[in-house]
Each structure stands twice: as structure tokens, then as C-alpha cells.
């Protein structure tokens, strides 16, 4: 049987005018800033909130295969299923990054009949948010280098500048660069480097800000580097927070689009979950809560990364409790964690599913540690067999875990009704949500708590550099920030080859980064990179554009 590609399905779909999508959730035309017929920015100052806030349903996943387990697909499909059940619902997603689109993912707007549209626009440049973030980030780099060139009144030590330039592309050649070469008229030579845009602190700040004032305040607190006597230098010292916020004045507005089935969708912000906090913007989520009874959102990769950061960083900052959490599982991921090679994942292997279930079990138990009841969604693939699916269902029944088979990729919202009904039962019950740790704990104890309670590790080792940073950060008053772990998404450990549910391992923190504007400390583990590289055969090799301007090869 031949299946249509995601792009073919998207191109065959009929979109509703964006003003009609807006009207369906009470957004007036006065609050709408259209970008063509099917996309718009929302002026949140012109929205009238309802008396009660909508409930948040978080979608996370087990540890993924390199291809991903369809978390965005399930997120969109679940929202469509609520729509099918006549619920007042919105979906809130992150924006895709261009780098991974051309690298391995080929796009990130859901899949099959559970997509947000217009798919081409969202996957490419959308409404320009990432370009604005890239520009603001690199403008700050220019201001720093100019300040040093013009006499360096603040005494910035160019050997200790923490701020890097960014680009929305996977480009390993730019990880380490030298700038200011070519003589005195070209600035002061120093070492620099590039991160991918989604790792920029500006991205994190945009996603954690509640208003332009809040955005400006957070930008002003960014630590760009240190003086020669190791005192922090901030954007406020450079006096450019106003200029940077001005660049972002439109980017901070949430973007309204729609699913194939006409469910309103806010797609805004896009930090990665392995190198940043992995959640869409607070503004988009809160705007959706002002307009809908149920808001379905997602956090990147598995519960050990995106969901943990959603609970400990985003929900804490925003001041809301998730009403339910969906953990997406696939038969292929279970088999991979059960020891099956990636080339053999399409073959039936119930024993491997049994062996790999420990990975899903740990993710389920992790969610319970936050005081929220999880619901497992088996995201159906055409190569799954009845025996494999039945084993997972029987495991769930034996362990008193809610579970539903979802077929939203093939059937859209109708394929997610069973999951939606399970989630409805959960959100109607009270929960006892609480973050994993208190902010008053020392940084090293917060890191140890994540490693031992969420990852299953036994010990944290800090490099000599990280130990010095812990001491310095405490002296600077940064000890009460939450922690954002930078770790491989493929394993609970910092070794991506250690699959399943390993225990007793040690995790090494090689370096810490103070994101004082965003308000968290990044702990870098293993070989994690903040500027990815492209694979040997990038998805770009299969991409093209037709003579009439339509994309080919997005998926």
C-alpha cells in the first residue's frame, strides 16, 4: 500500500482563512496581525481572557530513536481528537529549526493527518521569529566587540567573553572561530564561536517572557562575560537591552495557524530540549489558556529532558500546573531499547518489546514523581504487530497505567479519541503537582537530584572547571536558579549507547553556563554540542522546489 507523504497530505488539505480560525476561539480581527491568508501574529494586549484558565496537557515521550517517535504528531492529533469530541481546545507547539530540517528531521509540524499548516511556511521561515532572534543575538555580539574596540570602558576581558554568535543551521565548522583579524581597523582579535539559534539565550528568554517589559528586563540580566578581576558584565552594563528588545518586538507575539482539521494552533519559540529548556513560549501557552478549556502542548525528546524542564523551569516560571501528561511510546523504540539494531526494527520481536519496556516504565514513573498521572500513548506504525501492541497493553494493565493506541497519523483526530477520553478522565481529577526540587537547594544538589531521581544514575562528577564555576556562581548569587541539563536524548545517561533503563552510572558535568537572563544554569554533560553538524546524507539532498514555487522533500 502506498502512503502519501506528509507534504502531499498537507498540499491536498483545504485551509480555512486565519480570521475564521481566530474567530472560533474568540480572537477578534482587531487582535489579529495577518501574514497572508493562513498565518497571523496575535496582539495579546487586545485579547479578552475568559474567567477561568484552560487546563494544560503536556505530551512527552520515552527515549527516542534517531527518527523520533511522533510526539508532535500525537500532540496535534490529540488536540484534533478533543476537537472531534466538541471540546474547546488549542494546541501549542514549538517552531521548527532550519538546521535539523535540512539535517535529519526534514520538518517538524506533525505528520500524516495530524499536522499543523501551512506546513511549508512553518518549516522554513514562518513569520520571521528565528531570524529576529538570530539578529538580536548577533547584534549583541557586535555591540560587545565594538565596545572593546572603542576603548573597553567596562574592562571586559576578551578571553572570558561567554556570549557567542548564532546561526539557524547545523554547521560544525563554525563551532570555533577567530574574529577581529586583519589589523587595528577590524577590531580586537579574539576567539569566538557559533551556536545554533535554538541554543541562544535570547531564544530561551523570548520563550520565558510574559511581556515586552519582562523581555527587556531578562535581556538586561544576560551575563556576556567577565572583567579581568572576574566580575560579571551584563547587557545592562552595555546599555543595549532596549535596542535588542526592539528587534524582538514582533517576534514575541504568538503565531496563530491551524491543524488539518481546523484546530487552532499557536506555534511559537523553539528551544531544543537537549541543549536548552525545550518548550514553546509561556506567552503562547498562557494565551491559549485564556482562550480554550484545554491546551495541548509538548516538550522536546523524552521525559528526562523536555518534561523535566517543563516542570522545573517553564511551569514554575509561568505559575501553572499541568493537568495531565501523555507519554508517547512506539513499538520500534521499545525494540531498540530491547537490543534490536536500527536496521531490524520493522521485524516482529515481542521479546525485545518486553526487554525494552523498562525504558517506558522509567519515563512513566518519572512523571509520577511530579505528582501528575501519566497516560501512555502507543503511536501506531504500519509495521507494528498485534502481538507487540498487546504485550504493551497487558504491561500497562498489570502496572495500573492508563494507555491508549493512537492512530492519528493515519486517521487524524478520530484516531486519537481513545487517548482523548483517557486524558479527560485524568484532567477531571485533582493532582498534587510539584517541581522535583526546591530552588533554595545548592546547584550541585539540584543536579544530583535530577541525575539520581530522573536519570537513575548513582553519582555526579564535576570536572575541575565545573567545580570552579560552582564556587564562582555561588559567589555571584546564582545558586538559586533552576538547572537546565544539556544531555543526549537517546539515553538516561550521558552515553547515548547506553539504552534501556541503565542504573548505577555516573554522569560527568564538564562545564556550567550561567543563563542569568533566562534565569537558569546549563549543565553540559558528555559530548553534547550547542552547534550540531549535518549527517553524511542530510535530508537536504532530497529537497527541491518546483518551478511554481512549491517545496519538495519536506517531511
Curated annotation (Swiss-Prot):
One Gene Ontology term from the biological process aspect of the record: tetrahydrofolate interconversion
A GO MF label: ATP binding
InterPro entries, A to Z: Formate_THF_ligase, Formate_THF_ligase_CS, P-loop_NTPase
Keyword Ligase annotated: yes
Binding site for ATP: 65-72
SUPFAM superfamilies: P-loop containing nucleoside triphosphate hydrolases (SSF52540)
Catalysed reactions, as listed in the record: (6S)-5,6,7,8-tetrahydrofolate + formate + ATP = (6R)-10-formyltetrahydrofolate + ADP + phosphate
This protein's pathway: One-carbon metabolism; tetrahydrofolate interconversion
Enzyme Commission number: 6.3.4.3
Disulfide pairings: none
Pfam families for this protein: FTHFS
UniProt key word ATP-binding: yes
The entry's keywords: ATP-binding, Ligase, Nucleotide-binding, One-carbon metabolism
Record family assignment: Belongs to the formate--tetrahydrofolate ligase family.
Record-given protein name: Formate--tetrahydrofolate ligase
